[in-house]
Amino acid sequence: MSAYIAMKGVITNVDENIRNDEDVAFEYEIQKTPQNILTWKRYIEYWKEEGRTDKQIRWLYERFCSQFVTDTSIWEDYIRWESTKEVVETSRIFWLFQRCLKSCVRDCDRICLSYLELAIEQYDLAMIRHALASSLMKMEREMHRKVWDPVIKFVEEKVLPLTQLDSTQEDEEESTDEAELINVLLVKGFTKGGFISEEISENGSRGDIWSSHILERYLKVAPQQKRNESLATLALTRDNITIKSVYEKYLPQDENSGKYLPSSELPFELNFNYLASLEKLGLDNQYEEFMRQMNGIYPDKWLFLILSLAKYYISRGRLDSCGDLLKKSLQQTLRYSDFDRIYNFYLLFEQECSQFILGKLKENDSKFFNQKDWTEKLQAHMATFESLINLYDIYLNDVALRQDSNLVETWMKRVSLQKSAAEKCNVYSEAILKIDPRKVGTPGSFGRLWCSYGDLYWRSNAISTARELWTQSLKVPYPYIEDLEEIYLNWADRELDKEGVERAFSILEDALHVPTNPEILLEKYKNGHRKIPAQTVLFNSLRIWSKYIDYLEAYCPKDANSSDKIFNKTKMAYNTVIDLRLITPAMAENFALFLQNHYEVMESFQVYEKTIPLFPPEIQYELWIEYLEVATSHQLSSLSPEHIRFLFEKALKNLCSNGIDCKTIFIAYSVFEERISGLISKSIEILRRGAVIGTVSVSTHLESRLQLWRMCISKAESTLGPSVTRELYQECIQILPNSKAVEFVIKFSDFESSIGETIRAREILAYGAKLLPPSRNTELWDSFEIFELKHGDKETYKDMLKMKKVLESNMLIDSASVSHEEGNINFVAAATSHAPNSHTLTQSTSSYSINPDEIELDI
């Protein structure tokens, strides 16, 4: 009946629409078989082909739909035809969709989705809601996702962006920079407080109510994985009433008070959205309680929440609460980045408050402002601003101490930031209470802090207080001995300046008392992993022993002897250091020198004997040099020659076996023998010993050995004659590397020439020529040429040139082993011995095997 009424103005009588026999035939057939859909479709197609009017075709479609009112395919065909007209009547299409959905109960999925799609295309919010409701009612639950997805997409992509573009004061608060934001919040807060009559734009609407209702409905059926995303989208609608009511469905409630609490199951952002809705709705008590709960649940968001709460206080005109919050936060922050953010916001807040109040005071609006009260507020904000700037370093130091209160350097920095002595004392006192000595990382730093604390009183002439402090400091269980060293040494220096040396001695002697079993205590301390106090091993402090000995030596009389108290204390201190194996090379030298200066030379020798074995070979060498120098000094030493020889031999045995270059000792030993016994041969033999030591490795201390060979041969030439000199030359040349032996070959040849042995000299040069290729042996060939020009003739000169040419063409570049080849030509025997004092050396070169190919020249 309703369909008939609706089409009353459209449908005319049959006579107006039936024009020809074909129409009559179709009418007859549909009257005969009205349920034959095919006949109806052919009838409509015929009219469309005939070009009947829209009004006529619509009349026939209405009859068709009335006959098959529950068939959605016919309604779809009708709607499709209406949609293809040149002028589409959207309202008529919506009307058809609604009639169809009202009539049909099954197979409505395509109709529903098409209806919804058209509504979304037309941005018709009312139709979208109707299409959504109809679709959800007609379609199976499993298909609802296909209904919701385009609607939610439309809300997110088309509707909400328009909501965000709506310019309100809320947008202004979110988009401006921080200084402008604070100013906006100040205006808002002062206006709400009734202090100013500033007009602010208030958004009277509830935001995007249409979207919020859609999303509220969607959240009831949304899948779990879409819930959080949808809640976040809901917050964008700014319909705070709906936001609050919907969010509360997902928040837990306090059993006693019934207040809603943050949910740990929801992300932080969603909890904060609820918090923001409470603020927008002016629910201050609920806002502050919820904020307090969020601070407990989200400690990692502490900074963000603090600044949000600060802005909230400003927007409510509660400037004192904001200042207190920021000040408290500065004293709690643990990270420099958080400190920097809060400090800058606090500074900006005080600056903007001062400028804002100053501007209003200049307007002189007595209706709203009490000049006196607000002048005082202005002064308070300006004072806070100035204080923030002045105390920046202190606040920064606070952060460092909160991070690690056991960092002594930070406390010392804090002391330096204080101006008065009283303030410095307070910092020292606080540091001593808060620092755990077992957690101090830098050895000696805590002890230096105690020293500085006491020095503060000492410089103020409060001597007894300083002493009490240092006495107390010695009871602290330091894990590092360096802390006690700092205190004792500093205290001793102060007492030395104030009371004299006896008081300083007493302080250090108290530290250096050696227990009965020091080794056991040292072992326990070493294995204690910083759990055993350093006081147990303080006696092992080299720094304190050094300072103590320095004091003793400085105040020991120059003419002191064994009857002098300080002299005996000095000796005892040195000996204790040796017993504890703390002695250093410098201390050993100083001890020996100290005894020598006080005429106890023999006792100084005992110092060398005891200390030398304590050091590595390199240090032993230096001490042996000093020891032997004093031992061989006839002004100081009374040792017998046999004892001195024993010392030389002992030194050489210990040092040479460890690869130490003992050239200096060999030379000193040689000089000593020549001076004491007058035996030149023995002196030369000592030099030879030094030169041949280490022949297993020809490069060992090579330069020192070369120098010893030069001294040895030079002395032999001048004192022992040709026979011994030849033996030394021969041994030297055979031991040394070829490149170094050439020097001695030339000297050997010159020596033979000087005593008239020219043939031997020529053979020696010929031998040396074979040691190296001519290109690397220029010095020898130059000498060879000079020799032939002076002592040879034309034939010998030619022979020399011929030899050089042969060697240049045949000799291998590497001839390092030529002197050691089997059958190598040895030196020719001398015709006569011209040395009346030709002695055989203690270790003769005859130990070498005789070469059967040795050339003997019968001169």
Swiss-Prot record:
It comes from the Eukaryota. GO terms for cellular component: cytosol; nucleus; post-mRNA release spliceosomal complex; Prp19 complex; U2-type catalytic step 1 spliceosome; U2-type catalytic step 2 spliceosome; U2-type post-mRNA release spliceosomal complex; U2-type prespliceosome. It is found in: Nucleus. GO terms for biological process: generation of catalytic spliceosome for first transesterification step; mRNA splicing, via spliceosome. Gene3D superfamilies: Tetratricopeptide repeat domain. HAT repeats lie at residues 17-49, 52-84, 88-108, 123-157, 177-219, 238-271, 427-459, 461-482, 520-554, 599-633, 639-675, 685-718, 720-754, 756-790. Keywords: mRNA processing, mRNA splicing, Nucleus, Repeat, Spliceosome. Involved in pre-mRNA splicing and cell cycle control. As a component of the NTC complex (or PRP19-associated complex), associates to the spliceosome to mediate conformational rearrangement or to stabilize the structure of the spliceosome after U4 snRNA dissociation, which leads to spliceosome maturation. This is Pre-mRNA-splicing factor SYF1. It comes from Saccharomyces cerevisiae (strain ATCC 204508 / S288c). The lineage of its organism: Eukaryota, Fungi, Dikarya, Ascomycota, Saccharomycotina. The gene is SYF1.
